Design a protein with these regions (language model features):
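Metal-dependent nucleotidyltransferase catalytic core
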Residues: 16-36, 41-55, 60-111, 304, ...
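Short N-terminal helix-initiation segments at or just after the protein's N-terminus
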Residues: 21-29, 114-122, 232-233
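Generic hydrophobic, helix-prone segments enriched in Leu/Val/Ile
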Residues: 10, 15-23, 120-128, 238, ...
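Conserved nucleotidyltransferase catalytic core and NTase-mimicking acidic/glycine-rich helix/loop elements
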Residues: 139-358
Length: 358
């Protein structure tokens, strides 16, 4: 049963035309794929009322099998010079959308259902909508935000690597899209309106005016260097804006063995590299040392370790001293947490202790 008038009160020419398209899809489904069509919904500008004379009809045509793709088509009506694309969607497509990998969820969430043939499919749609609502309220959404920003960084790197203005603009588009999605999901929201209303929806969020201004400047720029500069600014703002500080644990017995690992993995290799004047090996081992301490400090309240700020590629022996100084600082952290560093005079002392202790 069609209830198209539930959200369209005035029977205008466009409404009649849209109704004819929907009726045609239903009739064709009964003829060529009677078991395929599950339901039809309307979303986009026609559903929100944000239409103009060239607005087309966005439909959620939910199908149950590949036979349903017979309903898909694209066409242009010459009397109004409007193009239409009739897409078909499977439940798996909606399930993917419900994971919130992006914030363009209006098709899933806001489609006005005007025809239902399979009640089970409609019930599944409602469950997916509930899932999205819960997800956008959950802490899990912040993982999606990070994933989107990581994708934005990849596209930013592409923009720095490409020379052609057109390609840099395409890279910029991907950066902007990922960042906009990230900011919306961060606030537990999704885009309900079309592209032309993007800044209206962003204006409802507590972001700085500079955020939207940067996007406007990027899309209006003819200079690759300017685009890259603005993209960097946009990315840094978005990353800081969406940063979710989590409470860090106090150092505890969980860190037992980490000091010995830091010593074993890289300390003597840094010294060897210095003796051999091997700048590359020294660099890699110091970075690895810094990386492990950074990983620990991201989980535990042990302070910051900016070792590579002090790294000296010109005098490698300095790096041995730097390594030992930071090791000493970390040993104090372990001692304060009641962690005893395992040191033995020789291998026999180790074996004896190793075999005696459980």
């Amino acid at each position: 049963m069609i209830c198209y008038n539930c959200f369209n009160k005035k029977l205008k020419r466009g409404v009649i035309m849209n109704q004819k398209i929907i009726d045609a899809i239903i009739r064709k489904a009964k003829r060529v794929c009677p078991d395929s069509l599950a339901l039809i919904g309307i979303y986009g500008s026609v559903a929100t009322g944000d239409t103009y004379e060239k607005s087309d009809l966005d439909l959620l045509i939910l199908i149950e099998d590949d036979d349903g793709y017979k309903l898909a088509t694209g066409f242009i009506l010459e009397d109004n010079n409007v193009g239409y694309d009739i897409y078909c969607t499977k439940l798996d497509d909606l399930r993917h959308d419900a994971e919130c990998y992006h914030a363009h969820l209006s098709k899933l969430m806001d489609s006005k259902i005007v025809y239902v043939k399979n009640q089970d499919a409609y019930n599944e749609l409602c469950k997916l909508r509930d899932k999205v609502v819960l997800f956008l309220k959950s802490e899990e959404r912040f993982f999606r935000v990070k994933e989107l920003l990581d994708k934005a960084k990849i596209s930013y790197a592409d923009a720095c690597l490409h020379d052609e203005l057109g390609q840099v603009r395409m890279d910029a588009f991907h950066v902007i899209d990922c960042i906009l999605n990230a900011v919306m999901i961060y606030h537990g929201k999704y885009f309900r309106l079309g592209v032309k209303r993007t800044f209206d929806e962003i204006a409802n969020l507590p972001v700085s005016g500079e955020f939207s201004d940067n996007i406007r400047k990027i899309v209006a720029s003819n200079d690759t260097s300017e685009i890259r500069y603005l993209l960097k600014s946009l990315l840094l703002y978005a990353e800081k804006y969406t940063q979710k500080e989590k409470p860090k644990a106090k150092p505890s017995a969980v860190l037992a063995g980490t000091y010995e690992e830091l010593y074993s993995n890289w300390r003597n290799k840094v010294e060897e590299a210095a003796n051999n004047r091997d700048v590359y090996s020294c660099f890699v081992n110091m970075c690895s040392f810094n990386g492990m301490l950074s990983d620990i400090s991201s989980e535990f309240d042990i302070g910051a370790y900016n070792i590579m700020d002090e790294y000296n590629p010109e005098k490698l022996t300095d790096n041995v001293l730097i390594y030992d100084r930071y090791l000493e600082e970390y040993e104090k952290v372990c001692n304060k947490a009641g962690i005893k560093i395992k040191r033995f005079s020789d291998v026999d002392a180790f074996v004896s202790d190793y075999l005696e202790n459980q």
